[in-house]
UniProtKB/Swiss-Prot annotation:
Protein name according to UniProt: Sulfotransferase 6B1
Gene Ontology biological process terms from the UniProt entry: sulfation
Active site positions, chain numbering: H118
Stated role: Sulfotransferase that utilizes 3'-phospho-5'-adenylyl sulfate (PAPS) as sulfonate donor to catalyze the sulfate conjugation of thyroxine. Involved in the metabolism of thyroxine.
Similarity field: Belongs to the sulfotransferase 1 family.
Enzyme Commission number: 2.8.2.n2
Alphabetic keyword roster: Cytoplasm, Transferase
UniProt xrefs under InterPro entries: P-loop_NTPase, Sulfotransferase_dom
Any one Gene Ontology molecular-function term assigned to this protein's record: sulfotransferase activity
Binding site for 3'-phosphoadenylyl sulfate: 65-70, 140, 148, 203, 237-242, 259-261
Length: 303
């Protein structure tokens, strides 16, 4: 991640704000969804409507803890492979995070720009669709996502912690966590995953065959790489490789962003009733949908 100082500077500022923030005061609500006051403001959301996307922007959309930092790294490496230029991060890459002037500054950034986001499809600026930017949508099974989100809150020293996993799970299922409900996010994106400029990525598929996943991402973005280049990026993008470099790339929060990356870690925390509750929620929200099938829920969340 090229301009480490800017990336880390933003994270450090957010962590500093978090020190003084009680969990009960961590969120503000904008258009019905809770966001962390340490990273987002209503003024920034209002300014977001004026953001002008470009046709060669690369949008990475995901619910928190679904692998966006992983994909960010992979796309940065792909850009480097085809251009021989390290991708620079003059701003924190999550589109909705930062001050309201950032979109004005971003007009001067060279193409292609990587724009990460945790927003619902219908909360994104219209210019992304009008100008046909490429959108990678990353999903991870909801049980592992929940456990990863809990550990992020409770392991990072300066972020307000939950009293217990049970407390976090209750709030998660009510959508009272940063960026709201996983299932609301999923329902909102479900109808838009088969568009010409949209590519669905499953975290678990990447874990199973990283090189194949990188090749698919490269082809979707119109990057033509050799097998050797794909293999090189794959080696540099394993979870272990990224965790080893995480302090350099993401600062103090790095080791917590890349904690385990395992598939099935949910089995260490979910109780039987919680399992049933999430299985019912999945059935209610996503059974019979295109996204429901893509998530391979039975393989990764049952048994």
């Amino acid at each position: 991640m090229a301009d480490k100082s800017k990336f880390i500077e933003y994270i450090d500022e957010a962590l500093e704000k978090s020190k003084e923030t009680a969990l009960s005061h961590l969120f503000f609500t904008y258009q019905g969804i809770p966001y962390p006051i340490t990273m987002c403001t209503s003024e920034t959301f209002q300014a977001l409507d004026t953001f002008e996307a470009r046709h060669d922007d690369i949008v990475l959309a995901s619910y928190p803890k679904c692998g966006s930092n992983w994909i960010l790294h992979i796309v940065s490496e792909l850009i480097y492979a085809v251009s021989k230029k390290k991708y620079e991060y003059p701003e924190f890459p999550v589109l909705e995070c930062g001050d309201s002037e950032k979109y004005q500054r971003m007009k001067g950034f060279p193409s292609p720009r990587i724009l990460a986001t945790h927003l619902h499809y219908d909360k994104l600026p219209g210019s992304i669709f009008k100008n046909k930017a490429k959108i990678l949508v990353i999903f991870r099974n909801p049980k592992d996502t929940a456990v990863s989100f809990f550990h992020f809150h409770n392991d990072v020293p300066d972020i307000p912690s939950y009293g217990s996993w049970d407390e976090f799970f209750r709030q998660l299922m009510k959508g009272q966590v940063s960026w709201g409900s996983y299932f609301d996010f999923a329902i909102n994106w479900n109808k838009h995953l088969d568009g010409d400029n949209v590519k669905f990525i499953l975290y678990e598929d990447l874990k199973e065959n990283l090189a194949a996943g990188i090749k698919q991402i490269a082809e979707f973005l119109g990057f033509f790489l050799t097998g050797e280049q794909i293999q090189t990026i794959s080696v540099q993008s394993t979870f272990q490789a990224m965790r080893a470099k995480s302090q350099d790339t993401h600062g103090a929060v790095g080791p917590f962003l890349f904690r385990k990356g395992e598939v099935g870690d949910w089995k260490n925390l979910f109780g039987e009733i919680q399992n049933q509750e999430m299985d019912e929620k999945f059935k209610e929200c996503l059974a019979g949908t295109s996204l429901g099938a893509k998530l391979k829920y039975e393989s990764y969340c049952q048994g």
